Amino acid sequence: MENIQIKNFIYDIATGYIKSYSLKVILELEIPNKLKNECNGYNEHGLYVLLRTLSTMGIFKEDEEIDRLFSNTEISETLINDTDKYPWVNDSYFQVTLLPYFKHIEESLKTGKAMGTFNSGYNDGFDFIDKEKNLKKYFHNTLTEYTRTQIDSILEIVDFSNFKTIVDLGGSQGESIKKILDKYHLNNSIIEKGINYDLKEVIENNEKNYKDNRYFEIMGNFFTDETFPIGNCYLVKYIFHMFSDNQVLEILNKIYKSIKSSYQNEVCIYIFDHIIYKNKKSIPISIEYHTINILNGGKERTLNEWNNLIKLSNFKIDKVSSLPNILCSFIKLSLN
């Protein structure tokens, strides 16, 4: 790299907040939607600066002949308020709203605590999401979209047909359990129940139009409930990276307490989460690691860290495998 390239590279990182805040504003004001009609009600020069800035990145296009005239591009079209067509936009919107909390990086570094949310008046990241009602929808839609992008790969790798009761802990909108029940009908499996377990406010807002009578939703809380719904298969998707080692062990211990009197060696836990592989660079995982650390004190783990953590529980690791997308791996646990 030449000095000028290094300079430009560092400058691009240093000014990244401009891009993020600009994206945040156009999403909040639904500018891509309004460009389809008319974009009135804003200061003309301020709007021009915003659109001009984003047009240099390919978001919006400035007319070559008419001054201050902009139109949508293929990129900005995806930001039009149609999350059924482009559901990943939920995550982009959620991410850019987190910008203010990153000003506490230095204090988090010094204290080892999630100061981003604490200094902003929240107990933790979940308290933040719960109280910021406008963000809650985007957060849970993001979790559902993560599931949708991975569930087909999961169903190809994992055979769920021999489990009687499958419990998805923190299952959000129930996408995983529904997909499993859709694949394994009563005539080709022994599945009697598929339970989606999540917070009261999540379950209450879920759609109630799924018809399979094996599907159940149960309200609860990882840390205030003494036990969880009883099953012989548990799914824990994108959950453990949001918590500290002690919190993960608390959840695993509650699973053990829930099943120890009902099942012996039949129980499996499938953890779907990130594994940090040092020889593979993943910008999305690194960014998400930074985010959950600032918001909630969570952590991404290397394979060695996963091994050491599980050894402290009543379970053992049977299998570790990567899904086709490097962003997700699965760890299969059974009772010791």
Curated annotation (Swiss-Prot):
Lineage top rank: taxon: Eukaryota
Gene giving rise to this polypeptide: omt2
UniProt cross-references to PROSITE patterns, sorted A to Z: SAM_OMT_II (PS51683)
Full protein name: O-methyltransferase 2
Family (UniProt): Belongs to the class I-like SAM-binding methyltransferase superfamily. Cation-independent O-methyltransferase family. COMT subfamily.
Pfam family name, one: Methyltransf_2
Single biological process term from Gene Ontology: biosynthetic process
Keyword Glycoprotein: no
Binding site for S-adenosyl-L-methionine: 170, 198, 221-222, 237
Keyword annotations of the record: Methyltransferase, S-adenosyl-L-methionine, Transferase
Species for this entry: Dictyostelium discoideum (Social amoeba)
EC number(s) stated in the UniProt entry for this protein: 2.1.1.-
Catalysed reactions listed for this entry: (3,5-dichloro-2,4,6-trihydroxyphenyl)hexan-1-one + S-adenosyl-L-methionine = 1-(3,5-dichloro-2,6-dihydroxy-4-methoxyphenyl)hexan-1-one + S-adenosyl-L-homocysteine + H(+)
A molecular function (GO) term: O-methyltransferase activity
Residues annotated as catalytic: 241 (proton acceptor)
Top-tier EC class: transferase
InterPro entries, per the entry: COMT-like, O_MeTrfase_dom, SAM-dependent_MTases_sf, WH-like_DNA-bd_sf, WH_DNA-bd_sf
